[in-house]
C-alpha cells in the first residue's frame, strides 16, 4: 500500500480545531435528521432527503469546478492502475449507514447517548485503522495509551447506560451507532487517501454523496413498498439542512485526516460531538432526558479518546561523548 508524502497544509492546532468543528457539525446533523425522521415518521425518507440534498449541492459545485473535475480523472486513473484500492470508492456506504442510524436511533435515545456510543466506535476504529496504516498518515503502532483509551471508551458507553433499561430491546439501538463509528473511521481514512490522490477534498466528498445517495435510494424504495410514503413533508427549513452540514464536515475530515491521522482527527471530532450533544439535549431535550450518568459517560468518552491519542514518551537516546584528541 503506497503512502504519499506531503507538506503540511496547516499547523496541527488548526487541524485539531477543524476536527472539533467537524464534530460539532456531525452532532448537529444527527439531531436535525433524528427530528426530521420523527416529524414524518419515516427514517428512510428523511435519510435519503438529507444525503440527496448534499449530493445535489456537490453536483452543482463540481460541475463548475475544474479542480474537482481534474481530481475525479486522477482518482479514476489511480483506481485503474491499482494506485488505490477500489473499495475506498465505497466509503459513501458508511456515510449512508451513519445518516440512517441518526434517523433511526436519535429519537429513541437522545443525541447525547447516541453520540457516546458512536464515538466509542470511532475511537476503536481509529485505533486499528492507524495500526494497519489505512489512512494517509501511515501506520501507527499499538501502545498502552491507545489500547487503554479504546477499552475506556467502551466503559463510557456502559456507564452512560446506568439508569436505563438493560433489556435487549433497549440496548440494541445503540449497537447501530457503535458499528457506524467504526465504519465512519474507515470512511474518514478512505476519504483522506482519495483526497491525497485527487488533490482536492471536493472529489472524495462528491463520490461519498453519490454512492451514499444511491444506497439510500434503494433502501428507501424497498421500505416504501411496505410502509408507504408520508402524506406531506414539513415546511420548516431547518429540517433540510442535514445534507449541507454533511458536505462541510466530510470535506473537513478529508483534509484534516491526512494532517494528523485517523485517531487524532477522531479525538478532535469527539470533543466537538460530545460538547454539542450535551448542549443540544440540555437546551432542546428530546425523548430521553440527559441524566448525570450520561454526562459522566460523555466526559469519560472524551478522556478515553484523549488518552488514546496522547503521545508516547520516547526514551532519551544516550549519545556517547567523542573521544578526546590525543
For each predicted feature, which ranges?
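Small-residue-rich segments of transmembrane alpha-helices in multi-pass membrane proteins
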Residues: 19, 23, 47, 89-96, ...
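Hydrophobic alpha-helical transmembrane segments of multi-pass integral membrane proteins
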Residues: 14-18, 43-65, 87, 151-152, ...
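Loop-to-transmembrane-helix transition segments
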Residues: 15-19, 70-97, 145, 172-178, ...
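C-terminal ends of transmembrane helices
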Residues: 61-78, 125-138, 186-197, 248-260, ...
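Membrane-interface helix termini and inter-helical loops of multi-pass transporters
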Residues: 30-41, 74-75, 104-105, 158-170, ...
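Helix-helix packing/entry segments at the starts of transmembrane helices
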Residues: 112-121, 202-211, 248-281
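Juxtamembrane C-cap of transmembrane helices in multi-pass membrane transport proteins
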Residues: 28-41, 100-109, 134, 189-198, ...
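Juxtamembrane helix-loop boundary signature in multi-pass membrane transporters
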Residues: 1-20, 127-182, 295-326
